[in-house]
Amino acid sequence: MSLIVSPFAVIAASAAAVAGVLFLIYAALKSGHRDASLPPGPPTVPLFGNELQIPKADAHFQFMKWADEYGGTFSLKRFKNTTIVISDRKLIKELVDKKSNVYSHRPASLVSHLITHSDHLLVMQYGDTWRMLRKTVHQYFMEPNCEKEHWKVQEAEAKQMLYDFLTAPQDHMLHPKRYSNSITNSLVFGIRSKTVHDEYMERLFYLMEKWSLVQELGATPPVDDFWLLRVLPQWMTGHWRHRALEVENLMQSLYTTVLDQVRDRRARGINRDSFMDRVLDRLDKVPLTESQLRFLGGVLMEGGSDTSSSLILTIIQAMTKFPAVQARAHAEIDRVVGADRSPAWSDAAQLPYINCIIKEAHRWRPVSPLGVPHAVAQDDEINGMVLPKGATVVLNVWAMHHDPRRWPEPERFEPARFEEFPALAPTYAASGEWDKRDHYGYGAGRRICPGIHLAERNLIIGVAKLLWAFEFTQPVGSYSDIDPESGASQGFLHCPKEYGCGVRLRAPEKRDTIVREFQEAQEVFARFD
């Protein structure tokens, strides 16, 4: 039997094939194209858009150059994705703060989902679950609780930090990490980090390094915007899935272990009234899944440990490079506190220059130069430009903090810039006036860091005590790099690379004070034994 194919069928099949090819070509051209309604930006190429122009690390430097060229709001195309990069402080107030119901979402992220199962407060989508978890965190770390309860732990841990610097100055890169991690773990889990070699601390900072590298903008292929990247061999796409699953395993292991320790303690009848104790006490009223419990404790461990320690390390390094700043800080502290005690939180109002130093550290070396991306929940329009639903929104913190029109000589560490901002950061973040914001180190809008009150006190207490006790210098022949492009770690979180530092006790009589106060701190530490 012979088959006879109609000429019309051949023509129809050919036409369909041609149409299919033309559609694919059109889709490819459309994918990377920037619509005229979008904010301006660098020229695109078909299919890829601007993807090939975005650095795989430290993109904030290039983004600042583009901001100089295209303005405080520019757009990038990453295949079909639209990314809006904002360094216009007024616009951030108008959008992220005042339209928080539209700009509090996170971009869809397969990588984040693989790591956190969508249960991590930092990358969780905006909605009822996020609001419930955020409220739970806020209630424990709001300012009244910091003033009434948490400061005791902060003071005690800062006293140990002084003792650690006094007795082991060679570990200067580790002491601020132990300080911030122990405060966080004590308050969140009722578990101290007693030494710089604490297991949980070491595991946390190791996973944070991996997590930071995976989450950095440009470091992972845009697998959410071009499906083919999901199925290509891993060796062709930077092993993104393997890297994500490695972080997931590290997080699950650590956070499960710590939560299990809290439960074991409670099973023995010991309730330390930590954050996690209170959460477990209320599970009948606020039910959480096991995954939500693990990541709720985990996100607090991450945020509370990393930001404060990175900034303290930045400040110590700055003191070695800008001795006039350190001398002024010493003089201010000496006017308020003698050698018989170290500064306390109750002295903060009399130490305005210390507050300025902390603000300048946020500005000079922001821990997260591009923040955590937001997403647009619905089409929006600003200044005649369309910000489409689903677009990624990046707050260009680095550009705002290093704008020479706002901050002359931005690479100079000059705390006096902030003398017009005497209050703590939460005051200016809550201000309705965009030009009254001091810095963006804690984010913006409803996604602002929920531990902002605790973090401010960590920094003021820790830095004031350190500068009361010590003079920090750069030893002859040691290495200390403050170049922003080579002196900091890579990732979406930045910390100074290891640097040489001399630690000199400012007065012999302060040695006895440091030892005595460390002994007095044992009364607070006993609560966690």
From Swiss-Prot:
Gene name of the record: acuD
Biological role stated in the UniProt entry: Cytochrome P450 monooxygenase; part of the gene cluster that mediates the biosynthesis of aculins. The pathway begins with the synthesis of 6-methylsalicylic acid by the polyketide synthase (PKS) acuA via condensation of acetate and malonate units. The 6-methylsalicylic acid decarboxylase acuB then catalyzes the decarboxylation of 6-methylsalicylic acid to yield m-cresol (also known as 3-methylphenol). These first reactions occur in the cytosol.
A molecular function (GO) term: monooxygenase activity
Pfam assignment, any one: p450
PANTHER family: CYTOCHROME P450 MONOOXYGENASE ALNH-RELATED (PTHR46300:SF2), P450, PUTATIVE (EUROFUNG)-RELATED-RELATED (PTHR46300)
Protein name (record): Cytochrome P450 monooxygenase acuD
Gene3D superfamilies: Cytochrome P450 (1.10.630.10)
Residues engaged in binding heme: C449
Cofactor: heme
